[in-house]
């Protein structure tokens, strides 16, 4: 009887420590209207990140690329997907494409971070994350708009570059199918960033891994930045 009670207790403990569900909207644009603004791998970046969380098996993933990445579709996807989250869950927006000060360049115009955060605030999830792989991504803090002190938001921002830097696409000859930031983000989320080998990648671990890899691979030309109001030990993924 004691053995049965002990086994039952262990079973309940295991249930209580199961990872919370992650709700992610992953979008990328390589093919912008016209030809001058096209990128090479941004659409694949979004597919790569969505694939990681889909394979994880504990995530609800929305992924769309190129002409599907309109302001309306992105906002609708975030509202519908993030609304499903409970307080113990996490919500994530991943974007790869062009950036502007204070926002993202969708297929049909600019989606400002203020709009993204407005939607995120409506979610019950306690863990909220934004990953952006775009040139001058860090410039989002340097807008002229009022009331844009995003560092006070309960959101982790992980941005591919400083405000004055370009986010590099990997050269064709390297064989990589992702931009430099997402190359290391993928490696980190698949276990490379798990320094203490506990099968959980935290915000601090993914930052350290990606930052070091990108800075070294770019020859000190690109420096990912992470900021916001969050716990550095916040789990990003259980792999």
Which residues are covered by each model-predicted region?
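Cysteine endopeptidase catalytic domains of the caspase/legumain-like
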Residues: 2-7, 16-239
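Repetitive helical segments and hydrophobic/amphipathic motifs
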Residues: 11-12
